[in-house]
């Protein structure tokens, strides 16, 4: 009987250890995680690319593009950690594309071409139904219309004993934070002031929500801060 139960107990322990997390999320010193006037031509918004200048040079990012080279060191370490042990992603609709309202057709398949960088089931929050979209490289987009809790349950089921990564955008992360559903956040603070855009911290009291800084390290390009839920 014990031999039969051991794999089940082990699976339950692993599931308990899996996390819901935000990783490698770039933020300006004044809290902005995206620029203004995001569009098809400028998906990160005005000055948005500046937020990722710690990430773009890394070996991890180069490998995601199918390229060789790239920097190693602390920035690359955090970038790589963000991609490890991820069994499913959750994205807000804006992270999938610029289309608003009801889907006019199925032509839009995301910002990333035929092979997105996720490689696991990816759940997109939306108010408008759409059939699942299977892409090259293991990514399947599932469109969830019944809220953040439903999306998280689907993602946990798909991830099995691995982590669920919340990819953004700002509004999506804020919803999950307010619901106290995120276990940890890795924020990469860039030494820039944006002045406008989408501010991650507006209306949030992270201390009251139970988060505390458990690790921080600085490089030339970013200060990496790990916030973990304490209660």
Give the ranges of each region predicted by the language model.
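Enzymes that bind and transform nitrogen-containing heteroaromatic metabolites
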Residues: 2-231
